[in-house]
Amino acid sequence: MSRDKKIHATRRSFLKTSAMAMSYMVGGKALLLTPAAARAAQMPMQILSTLEVSTLEVICEAIVPGSRSAGIAAFVDYQLAEKPQDALLMGRYLGLEPPFAPFYQQGLAAAHQAALEQFDRPWSQLTETQSKSLVD
């Protein structure tokens, strides 16, 4: 019985990690990385600009602490680059028409503008309190 539990736990661990793995081409070879590993390795973004990445990370960090280091921007960027039918982003389930990138980019631009109007600086330069006040 303990052997069965061990196999089950190993299978569960494998499925959990492989579901979040993303494929990157590095030096002509495909690498499977988690969003956190992709962020740590500073993998280039395919869709989002540097400003969009910094805005997304700070907003997400205000909502879900730890999301920046977990690689939220790498995950979103990777999903935006996927075929719409393969994307795991909520826009797909809310009836948005593909491509999804403009929807996310317009939202990030609006968030950036709101921070500039209210605090006279980009969202990525706001204090934690200021950032949370815009999210609340």
Tell where the protein language model's regions lie, with residue ranges.
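Sec-dependent signal peptide hydrophobic core
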Residues: 18-26
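Flexible, low-complexity segments enriched for small/polar residues
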Residues: 42-45, 53-56, 60-136
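C-terminal segment of N-terminal export signals and the immediately downstream linker at the start
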Residues: 3, 7-13, 26-62
